[in-house]
Amino acid sequence: MLPALETTLPLLLFWGGIGYLLGSVPFGMVITRAFGLGNLREIGSGNIGTTNVLRTGSKAAAAATLLLDGGKGAAAVLLARALAGEDAAQLAGLLAFLGHCFPVWLGFKGGKGVATFLGLMLALAWPVGIACCLTWLGVAVLRRISSLAALCAAVAAPVWCLLLGAPQAAVLSALLALVILWRHRENIARLRAGTEPKIGQK
């Protein structure tokens, strides 16, 4: 189920653009440079997300990246919802997520979108967002593999939407889950081979 269309096309395009610009801010790279940790593209996997920031050895930098990457997804949703409507909020959230994954500033080579996904789900439907966060946390604690935790949280999101009374977010969450699965295709191959590194490993 999708939200009813209640916003004009020009406003939808505007909020989609705002969402994309918010999402495309590469906080992981900004923070690692601000902390004097070097160029994130030359560290670990070269990814701009929280897991790779953690490979610098700075838990503070990783926590800041997690909060800001999640925050930009939430901000896009909350701003669009407050000033336009639910349809604009979902579009802004989607574009914030895609902005993180494909930022124009980095030649469309960004992160895998997990923190931004969790942030925008918390803003769209907080019970679903909390359930997704707990899913991620549970798998991460039990298996110590960040990518597996992310995949489980993403795949569970549409189910949580239906179980927790947020069917209007189910289609969007399913679309985001598909993108996350695709962005993690190399991780999936390593998981199948048993070579995926655990959290904290470089």
From Swiss-Prot:
Residues of the signal peptide: none
Keywords, in A-Z order: Cell inner membrane, Cell membrane, Lipid biosynthesis, Lipid metabolism, Membrane, Phospholipid biosynthesis, Phospholipid metabolism, Plasmid, Transferase, Transmembrane, Transmembrane helix
A cellular-component GO term for this protein: plasma membrane
UniProt-listed SMART domains: G3P_acyltransf
EC number(s) on file: 2.3.1.275
Pathway(s) of this molecule: Lipid metabolism; phospholipid metabolism
Family note: Belongs to the PlsY family.
Protein name: Glycerol-3-phosphate acyltransferase
Name of the coding gene: plsY
